[in-house]
A protein has these predicted regions:
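Append "and, occasionally, other polyanion-binding protein interfaces
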Residues: 1-143
């Protein structure tokens, strides 16, 4: 079984030479940039837990993530969804400052799943737009 595992890993690395974390069996992998982005997200999440623990002694630090799965999800956000690592980090910065979303987006997969909703809800321009906008149809119906 050992030679088969080594062969599978070598074949995988031949197909994905920039993979620094990978699981040939699960077909998951990530580049160094994907892993770095995943680790940055983890640091932000740990900071949220540490802040919560200051107020509530029952809060326990979560276990380390599966780095291959996290880096793979980051890679998919870049490759399939067209996001950059910078955009991913900027979005998570906004998420981490929101009282609701910081509790509900605690992984790259959840960030990816909720991206469209988050980009609208957490966009600074949306709250400004809805506050300043006057809808003539709405106003006319109540005048």
């Amino acid at each position: 079984s050992q030679p088969d595992t080594q062969t599978a890993e070598q074949d995988f690395l031949t197909r994905h030479p920039d993979a620094v974390v990978f699981s040939p069996k699960k077909r998951q992998w990530g580049t160094q940039d994907d892993l770095t982005c995943a680790q940055w997200l983890w640091k932000k999440i740990i900071a949220l837990y540490e802040h919560a623990a200051e107020c509530d002694g029952e809060v326990v630090r979560p276990k380390e993530p599966n780095w291959t799965a996290w880096a793979n999800e980051i890679r998919l956000m870049c490759v399939q969804d067209g996001r950059t690592h910078k955009q991913i980090c900027e979005m998570y910065n906004r998420v981490s400052r929101d009282p609701f979303w910081c509790r509900n987006v605690l992984s790259p997969s959840k960030l990816r799943e909720k991206w469209d909703e988050l980009s609208l809800r957490l966009s600074p321009s949306v709250s400004t737009y809805t506050e300043k906008r006057e809808d003539p149809y709405f106003k006319a119906s109540y005048d």
